[in-house]
Amino acid sequence: MKLKVGVIGCGGIATGRHIPAYINNPNTDLVAVYDSSVEKGEKIEEEYGVKAYKNLSEMLMHPGLEAVSVCTPEMTHRDIVIEALKSGKHVLCEKPMALDSKQAEEMLKVAKKTKRILMISYNQRIYEPHWKAKELLKQDIIGKPIAFRSFLSHGGPEIPYMERTGRSDFLTKTEGTVAFFYR
């Protein structure tokens, strides 16, 4: 039996990661998408034959829908995650989880109350350069660090949607990998 999933937000992380992962996973069935941009949702509907909704609440009532990925800008995460949890869905939310610890705690309380799973997509925990760093540490090649910092970056121009969505300039500079070890 396949897990019936939906994707909320049809931007780059959804179209580049979540949607292809669900489409190609034999254990999942992507059944619904929602984006505040109707055109983005319709494009996914045309490309994959998945029902695109114009209203989030309606999408969350899709028959058989069990779990959703939240792939929207972080300032929307709390409200969307809470609505999805209250509708009985398990949630995989993109990072960062929330704007502050108060919002994160609210989300966790609702997950606990509804007995739904809330998982945050901190995918860098399994990122190959981080595993290599762990290997080097185990072999005592680089010594004992007192702090570790990793940045993800791209080599292209600034991302035009950042200003429009309110995402900080910091995020535009932290995509790609550079690791720093401090002793």
Label each residue range with its predicted role:
Residues N27, G64, I141-K144:
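Glycine-centered tight turns that cap/initiate beta-strands
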Residues V50-V110:
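Beta-loop-alpha module in the N-terminal Rossmann-like domain of NAD(P)-dependent dehydrogenases
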Residues E106-N123, G143-F148:
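Rossmann-fold dehydrogenase core element
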Residues M1-Y48:
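N-terminal Rossmann-like dinucleotide-binding module
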Residues N25, H62-P63, Y127:
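Acidic-histidine catalytic/liganding microenvironments
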Residues Q124-R183:
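Predominantly a Rossmann-like dinucleotide-binding segment in NAD(P)-dependent oxidoreductases
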Residues A32, E66-A67, A147:
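Short, Asp-centered acidic motifs that coordinate Mg2+ and/or phosphate
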